[in-house]
Amino acid sequence: VQPGTYNVDIYFNQSLSKRQDISFILDSSSGKVKPIIRLALLEELGVDIQRLKKDGVIPTNANPSQIVDLMALIKGATLEFEVTRLALEISVPQIYVKRQVHGYVDPSLWDQGLTAFYTDYQANFSRNDSNGNRSDYRYLGLRSGFNIAGWRLRNESAWTGGTGSKSTFRSNRNYAEHDLSSLKSKFAIGELYSQGEIFDSVRFRGAQINSDIGMLPDNEIGYAPVVRGIAETNATVEVRQNGYVIYSTSVPPGAFEIADIYPSGSSGDLTIKIIEADGLVREYSQAYSYLPVMTRQGNFRYSLAAGEYAYDGQPSPRFIQGTVVYGLSNNLTTYGGGLTAQDYKAANVGFGVNSGIGGFSFDVTNSQSKGLQGNTDEGQSARFLYSKTFNATDTSFTMSGYRYSTAGYRTFSQHIDDLTYFNEQSSGRQKSRLDMNINQSLGQRGSMYASLGESSYWNRQGRTRNWQFGYSGTLAYASYSLAIAHTEGSGGPNSDTQFTASLSIPLGRSDRSHRLYANALASQHGDSSVQSGVSGFLNEGSTLSYSVQTGHSKQSGNSSGIGLGWDTPTSRINGNYNQSRDNKHMDLSAGGSVVVHQDGITFGQPLGETFALIEVPDVSGAGVDSSASIRTDRKGYAVVPYVQPYRYNWINLDTTTLGNNTEVSESSAMLVPTRGAIVKARYASVQGRRVQFDLKQDSGQPIPFGAQARDSQGKVLGIVDNLSRLLVFGIHDQGVLELNWSSGSCKAEYHLTPVKRDRAYERFELRCRTSSAQ
């Protein structure tokens, strides 16, 4: 390498740590070019500088900008530079390495990604025919975006329609955002949702800046909920947040679990609506974010939002909201915030504690609001949140909490309701709410879960309540589950309790085995049903699935149905048809994506918030290890969805899908995208024929072991092995081989027959005209 400054990848103890400019200078004493290494860089990489000072390796007053000779400084340390990869390899004995925080990635590696446009779609259609009464349901969800210069321009829209309702297309929101890596934050402008950690999240038009916890290490990041329920028939499950449909899917009878919901905002309860095939609708709510407010010592999280309230048909007062969370110690967090608008003010103060009995937080919010009639209401709301995993019993309490509000308390949304409705909807305001979620592992005997949600309201009799309990386990190769769910309105007629049991038995030992299953369901309304069937995959790659079932219901009589699912490289398609004595049900769904980038248009499967575009130039059908259904198109491009922002993502090519006539120099690529980025991985490939020549000299003697083979342009093709064979890749269909060894040389003309693609390599015998060594 020549002296100068190079932008290099720095590997610390074999792990990619950061990317930055490093200066290389000529060492006059050794005559070699060496990198300039300073103490500050070693500390950034994770070297324990304090330990070096304690052991007398460096002076206690050493300056961070001091240049050091690493290998002379630390015994056992190594320093190597690989110029072909621009990679600087630094190795330091573990005794002088600080304990690394799991999940931390240096910001210098964060990739803003490509300039590109995409749209991600999910289309659902269902039809129910009950005693000749036909009803349809249609849904199309779109998430579109354009990335340029680190900006993320986004639109979320949904089109819904059905029998008896007008088809509507609604744009949930349009916004633009950009990360602020130096602040571990992001800035957004447009139609947004305010942060809901302290105050309830609201939809607004304006601007917002807030901490992005995705930039933090793993141990400081929370999690989102799993939606569970029980469907009595082939039902449609619709999930809404802040009044907008954010998820819709079809589920078969029995217990269901949805874990891949993509929320619109940072908070706001989820409303789950189960639309049964016979028209029965059940609805309940579930907390989206219900973790104690805590952070580590010295950590600071914040949010600041300004704009105008934005819900259809309601007033749009301007407001400003700010919140802060600060870790006083590893066991004590303080937080608070304020919200001010015309005729409304709210202030919050609270604390979080990490203790031996779990993590909990407690806060109080005070509100003052003026209604349409000029009256001023003031009230308080107290909230307690709790989370704990008991290692001894492997019991987890997650998203558990209790809130109590006085009669005069108003959230910002409730204040807007008071301005919208003259009678001020006092009977609809929540008085208290209890949420509890427990997960219990039973080891080899399975696992259990239980959840409870209960709310009471001012000036309204009764309570709304929903609770669920489930158990799942395995017996030999079979798996089974039991579940019970209850929903109850505040004095309404829609209360119901359901019980379901299921059993699944594999008809083989492989992962692709067909499975025999049975499901029984009973409800408080007196209906009961039994269903059994078989399901599995129809192809080697497990991308084409099927299910066939038959059953009997007390209400609907005998039933039967069939389902098909197909994961293609460009979409996910599902279809189901079920028929009983009085009902016919059909549902179809398709999801996929379109990405427009500088090299063309690439179709793919449904995307996550952040995704990757891979390129294997001019190689179609190349796959990745993480998914059997992802394949490159005819240009060599494919979309890999759901990559993690601010984390290492290794995307490995499935080399068995490349074919015999393609080679890649590297089959793995490491990506670290920023949130919302479209990052690219390019795998350099070479295409050509793979041929083995069985060589002999004119005399019939073998070619000596180690002879070097070149083509007519002098390019080295390979070395002859000890059996006089030469394996080469990427040669022309005809040409001349030149072989040289210590005592002679020879030339051989070859003419290859048409390629045989079913073979790992082709084999030809070849005579070489020998000439004596000069």
Segment roles from a protein language model:
Residues 166, 191-203, 363-432, 482-502, ...:
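Outer-membrane beta-barrel translocator/channel fold
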Residues 3-11, 15-24, 618-627, 699-713:
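Short, ordered, surface-exposed loop/turn motifs in non-cytosolic proteins
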Residues 10, 229, 612-617, 689-698:
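A short, amphipathic beta-strand motif
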Residues 115, 134-140, 168-172, 223, ...:
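Residues that define the transmembrane beta-barrel architecture of outer-membrane proteins
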Residues 1-221, 524-595:
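Post-signal-peptide, soluble extracytosolic/periplasmic N-terminal scaffold domains
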Residues 22-23, 628-637, 714-725:
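Short, acidic Ser/Thr/Gly-rich low-complexity loop/linker segments typical of extracellular
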Residues 113-131, 148-163, 187-191, 301-310, ...:
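Transmembrane beta-strand segments that form the barrel wall of outer-membrane beta-barrel proteins
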Residues 121, 142-146, 173-178, 322-326, ...:
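Residues on the lipid-exposed face of transmembrane beta-strands in outer-membrane beta-barrel proteins
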